[in-house]
Amino acid sequence: MHPEEDWLAQVPVGGDAKRNLVASEISGDGDVDAVLADCDEVLEHAYHMRSFNQAMMETFRTYTELDRYGRLHVISSTQIVFHVRRILSRALGIPKSKIRVEKPRIGGGFGAKQTAVSEVYPAFVTLKTGRPAQLIFTREESQIAGSPRHEMEVRVRLGADKDGHIRGLDLYTLSNSGAYGEHGPTTVGLSGHKSIPLYTGGLEAFRFGYDVVYTNTMAAGAYRGYGATQGIFALETSVNELAEKLGIDPTIIREKNMLREGMKMPA
C-alpha cells in the first residue's frame, strides 16, 4: 500500500471510478511548520501497522423466522442490532418496522460483529419460503468473511525543546480500507484524535491529516481500538525516541506534556 500521485485506481474497486480515495481530511491549529522550525529537536518517522483478523470464540451465526405478526425476527450474534435492521431493510426492500433484530449474549466479537456478515442470507430464505432459517459460519468462513484491522502507515513529525517540552505535532495517516469503505472514514480519525490530545500540555500547534484508500484486498472494519491503536503506537514510539535522544526518562517526558485539569483537548 502506498499513496499514488493522482489516486487513480488501476482496477475496479468500487466508489469513484476516477480515484481510489474513500476519505480525506486535514485539520489542526496554529502554524505547525513555523513551530517545528523553531524547535531544538525535530523527529520525523513513519510507522507501518499491518492488517490482521479477529478470532472470537463464536463464529458468525444468524437465525431468522416470521413472528405472529408477520415481521422478520432476526436472532444474530452481532454488536449492531439497529444497523443490522437498517441494512436488512435496504437489502430486502422492506420497512424497518417489519424487522426485529435480537442480540443474545454473544461469544466474543472484538469489533468483527460491528459488520453485518451472516444476517442477510437466512433472512432472504425466510422471506421467500416463510420458514425459519439458520446460518452458522465455520471458522474458515468467518476468517474469509470477517473484517480485519485497518493497515495503516502513520507519519509523525514531533518538535520539542531541549528540556523535553513537546511544542508541535504533525501526524499523517494513510489507511487501507480494502475493497469497501464502511468503517474507513471513522477509524482513521481516531488515529489522530485519540493520540494528539495526550500531549496537550505545552503544545503550541498541531496538524492531523489522513487519506483512506480502496485497495483490492479484504475489506477492513472495526477491530479493538478502532484506529486509535495505530495512531497511539506511532506517537508513543516517537515520544520514546525523543526521550532517548534527549537522555530524559520517558516517564518524565510524559509528565511534562500530559493533559492537565482546565486544559482544552484538541479534537
Where are these regions (language model features)?
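Structural alpha/beta core scaffold segments of enzyme domains
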Residues: 1-267
